[in-house]
Each structure stands twice: as C-alpha cells, then as structure tokens.
Amino acid sequence: MGAKKNNNFVYFFGNKKADGKGSMKEVLGGKGAGLAEMTEIGINVPPGFTISTAVCGIFYENKKSIPAEIIDEITKNIIKLESSTKKGFGDSKNPLLVSVRSGAMFSMPGMMDTILNLGLNDKTVQGIIKKTNNPRFAWDSYRRFIQMFSDVVLKVNKDIFEDKLESIKKKKNVKHDVDLDENALKSLVQEYKKIVKNKTGKNFPQNPSDQLFKAINAVFLSWNNQRAIFYRKQYDIPSEIGTAVNVQSMVFGNMGDDCGTGVGFTRDPLSGEKELFAEYLLNAQGEDVVAGIRTPKNIKTMQRELRKVHSQIENTAKILEKHFRDMQDFEFTIENEKLYLLQTRSGKRSGIAAAKIACDMVKETLISKDEAVLRVEPEHLEQFLFPIFNPDDKKKFEILTKGLAASPGAASGKVALDAQTAVELSKKGERVI
C-alpha cells in the first residue's frame, strides 16, 4: 500500500498504514522515513507521527517557536494517536505516554536529544500503577522521565540526578538501578522533584500538553547544540536541512524480565557474516544500552532467555533485508515477550564486511553485480591498508578492556573523552583517540 498524499507538516504512522514513506528522508528525516516504511510493510512499530524537517526551519524563522496552525496540527495527531492506542493523553486511568525523538535526513547518532515516558505526572503515574499492577515499573518510568526532561528541556545538569541515584543505591546496598525496589524509586521521584524546584524555582510540569510542546521545542533547539554543529562540520552535513521530530507511543522494556531493549545489525558489520549481531538488556529502557549502566548481553544469550523473542528478531531481520536490500542497523524494544521496532537504517560496516555483504547479496539475488560494485566505496578499500595488531604480538600483552569497534584498524594515542578536548589535543600535535 502506498503512502497517502499529505500536504501538511505532520505525518501519522500506525496500524500498518503511514502518511509518509521510506523515500521521504528530506521531509521525515531518516528515522521518520524508516518508521513509515516499516509500518507499511507490516513490521510491528508503535504508532506515532513525524513532525517534518520543514517545521524546524519555520521554528527558527519564527523566533524559536512553533506557529499556532502547526500546534493545531500536532494536537490533531495526538487525538489520532489516542484513538489508535485506545489511551488518553493525560488520562488518569488509562494514560498515553510517548517518546519524543529527533531524526535528521542524515544519521547523527547521539548528537541530538531524546525524551521517553512523556505524559507522566503525579496522577498518570497512579493510573499506570493500577493498570499494570506494577508500581516498581511506574515509579522507575517516572524517575527516568523527570531526569530526561529536566536535562533536555529545563537544563538541569543530569549529573545532579545521577548523584542522587547513586546515593540511594549506596543507601540500599544495591549495585544496579534495576535492583532498586518500588519504595526506593518512589522516594527518588520525590527527591528529583525537589532538585527541579531548587534549580529552576518552579515545580516539575504536570500538564502533558505543556510537557509535549516544550519537548518538541527542545529537540528543534538541539539541532544547533555544540555536539550537533561539530558533527555536521565533520561530515559536511548542511545545517539548513533541519531535523524532524518523531512522537511515538511508548512501549516499555522496563516492566520486568520478559521485557527489554536492544540494538542490532542484520549481519555482522565487522566481518560481514550472515548472522545477527546485536546486544540487549532485560528490564531496561533504550538509553540503558548505550549509557553503560549495565553490560548488555549478546543476542545469542537470548536464545536461552527469550527464545520466542529471538525467533521474532530473526524473522524481522529477514523481512528488513528482503525489503531494503541491504544490511540494516535496527533498534528494538521487547514488551511482555512481544517485539517492537523503533528504528531501521542501512548499517555502517567495515571494508571487509562491505565486500563480503555485497558478494553474498548477489548470491542471494537481493542485488545485481553492478549494485554490488557500487556498494563497496573507496574508503572501504582504503581500510584494507590500515594498520592492525599483529596477532602474535597480541598474545604477549595483557588486555585491559574490550569493546565493539567504532572504526577500522588499530591506533594509539591520548584518550579524549569529548570532542572539544580531542580538537585541543590535536592542535597541539598530539595523537588522539
């Protein structure tokens, strides 16, 4: 089914129908285009809507505010989302919670802002408790929301919240966030609200509509944060293209041990082998995987822990590759052993992987030989010339730590923990990692 025509600024997706489509990256951004396309091909995607990149330009032209007519259009799509999910935004008995995420035409991982669990307040948290009979989950979601919203929108330093979290974990003698019980998390919510009051002079906002539009504004503002500007300069991404904003109904990976979150590739991005390459955490939300709160598990472990979900991921990976005709990088959430996809895009890969994937996809009749040649880019070939560790020498040294490769080859230099420090060290002639 093709996307229906839409001359407006907001594009809805859900229930196997989408206003947009995968070819509309300039309008929907990469994330929004992927969500629309996955919805159309029957992948299990939580419903939502994408505010187009054009609105980002209008936002800046309009003195960093969204015009009334676009606010009306967003409000209409919230009503549509309520109908689709059979939940109410701000409803105290059956509340709709949403995520608000950026999504430019070109991938800019981690450069802009995300807010999860939006719509929670002192009343809706009680509705979640009654509906799920899971108070620990409700308070965990609320404390996460307060921290994210306060950091991104209210500009309260997230380290203050982290320090309070660590203090409570120490007091309760637990190592991980997931080990805190409902009473500890409820207490943490009250402490977080005190921090907000102390730092801003105002109570934490309780009106879901107010929360939503402040979050959307914050995502547009994050298009011009220091990280995003630096990234665009590094990768020659034009600043005028703007970012889209994706507002999507929440699915929860932090409801218990049959829930979780993860990221993965449909093939190994390092070797190109045709096998799932992914990691996940149980009883967690999306940011936990990349934040290093706990060490994620290899996808192979899921065959033992959640065999049914592992099978769903394998089947979904096949559908994605068959449709997009390329190796995909995807993000997922598991809620009560049901798989939901939150993002897909063509995955970055090493030179070796690019060559192998291209050749294998020709054999699988997914792409032609001519396409395969174009899939191996000049920089992929250059990677074959990069220095690597001598396998024999590696045996002589003690390994301090391991991780997933962010770039090909081997390198040595001073460690810089942020972009600005890396630039300053580089200007001094230092070799920097």
Feature-to-residue mapping (PLM):
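Nucleotide/phosphate-binding sheet-loop regions of phosphoryl- and nucleotidyl-transfer enzymes
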Residues: 2-398, 418-433
